[in-house]
A protein has these predicted regions:
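Conserved N-terminal Rossmann-fold NAD(P)-binding element of oxidoreductases
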Residues: 46-47, 70, 349
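Glycine-rich phosphate-binding loop and adjoining beta1-alpha1-beta2 segment
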Residues: 4-12, 69-107
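Hydrophobic/small residue at the entry helix of a nucleotide-binding pocket
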Residues: 51-52, 355
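Rhodanese-like catalytic fold shared by cysteine-dependent sulfurtransferases
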Residues: 3-5, 101, 238-252, 256-304, ...
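Oxidoreductase and adenylate-handling cofactor-binding alpha/beta cores
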Residues: 212-230
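E1/E1-like adenylate-forming module used to activate ubiquitin-like modifiers
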Residues: 2-6, 107-121, 125-213, 223, ...
Length: 392
């Protein structure tokens, strides 16, 4: 369905702007009016990472007048494989500042506003209220539900994207005209069930594919052209090079945008998404050791069995000496339990400690009462014990 333009047009374009945007201006559906609307638009991008990088660059190139960036992280070398708004010289810098500099380099006429803070329930309403449209470039479920609920409560549209390995998804959520994210995903998946990009990986160029689609949808909404992806989920398979669409209907029983909503104010989203399950938290309490403690046990010849619960491709990048690989899913399915020694202390680890805590809960319930896991995982080990090893 077509929707009216989201913003009013700016009063005029300068001679330099006409020259810059001339290839837009000669498109009948965009023209002078559409470009003026882009100039007058205020768009917020949540995140300057894999999706935020191409989104910000193309929004800037398109002539969106004001771009807000919510980002609190710093540029890491592992980001550069996909986060093309940053460069080698930006490693260690604020992502927000790095993104701002790239945006200004692409288009000096864009006004950039930085929000160098973590997006949370106590600041999201104030930040979002300053913008016409939100572009969601987040990679965790807690923030996705936060973005969705804030947009519903503020009646703001937002363009959503998701990436994992070779697969991508995109849609436009606007509860006034169609479904919201909760209509599609009423409940978050169990903690640890869906790996993040840091755990499962992502093809770098996939970020550009989905990020560009997000910008395309943003331009359509701002200028009031075409049919935005409201009520439609676009699914992209990069390996098969296939696009398909699934219709998504507004759920009358949706907790936030339904006929009788139960979520009428923002909640604790990390608790809602169970960033670490209660079982894992309980299991880890009193059963977490540091990388330095593990190093002491190894040096002292303690009778331990170090088990890495990551995936094999992660194990091949970097591992703790003496650790053997048993992926998390083998524990969740129960197949790994029978092969565990009864006469050794089990020491679990993963990348950062989240997955190993989940496995620890499984072992505790199976009777391995003295099992422990390494807080901080292999990343903590590298940082504290073997800093010359690679991280990812």
């Amino acid at each position: 369905m077509s929707l009216p333009p989201l913003v009013e047009p700016a009063s005029e374009l300068t001679v330099d702007e006409v020259r810059r945007y001339s290839r837009h201006l000669i498109i009948p559906d965009v023209g002078m009016d559409g470009q003026k609307r882009l100039k007058n638009a205020k768009v917020l991008c949540v995140g300057a990472g894999g999706l935020g990088s191409p989104a910000l660059m193309y929004l800037a190139a398109a002539g969106v007048g004001t771009l807000g960036i919510v980002e609190f992280d710093e540029v890491d070398e592992s980001n550069l494989q996909r986060q093309i708004i940053h460069s080698q010289s930006d490693i260690g810098r604020s992502k927000a500042e790095s993104a701002r500099d790239s945006v200004k380099g692409i288009n000096p006429y864009v006004n950039v506003i930085l929000h160098e803070e973590r997006l949370e329930a106590d600041n999201v309403m104030d930040i979002f209220s300053q913008y016409d449209l939100i572009v969601d470039g987040t990679d965790n479920f807690a923030t996705r539900y936060l973005v969705n609920d804030a947009c519903v409560l503020l009646n703001k549209p937002y363009v959503w994207g998701s990436i994992y390995r070779f697969d991508g998804q995109a849609s436009v959520f606007w509860s006034e005209h169609g479904p919201c994210y909760r209509c599609l995903y009423p409940e978050p998946p169990p903690p640890g069930m869906v790996p993040s990009c840091a755990e499962g990986g992502v093809l770098g160029v996939l970020c550009a594919s989905i990020g560009s689609i997000q910008v395309n949808e943003a331009i359509k909404l701002l200028a009031g052209i075409g049919e935005p992806l409201v009520g439609r989920l676009m699914i992209y398979d990069a390996l098969e090079m296939q696009y398909r669409q699934v219709k998504v209907r507004k759920d009358p029983n949706c907790a936030v945008c339904g006929d009788n909503p139960t979520v009428t104010e923002l909640i604790d989203y990390e608790a809602f998404c169970g960033v670490v399950s209660e079982e894992a938290q309980e299991a880890a309490a009193g059963s977490t050791i540091t990388p330095k403690q593990l190093k002491e046990w190894i040096d002292d010849g303690e009778n331990i069995d170090i088990i890495d619960v990551r995936e094999i491709n992660e194990y091949e990048i970097v591992s703790i000496p003496g650790a053997r690989l048993i992926p998390k899913n083998e524990f969740l399915m129960g197949s790994a339990l029978e092969n565990l020694p009864q006469d050794k202390k089990i020491v679990l680890h993963c990348k950062t400690g989240v997955r190993s805590a989940e496995v620890l809960a499984v072992l505790k319930s199976a009777g391995f009462a003295d099992a422990v896991h390494v807080g901080g995982g292999v990343i903590g080990w590298v940082n504290q014990i073997e800093p010359d090893k690679p991280v990812y």
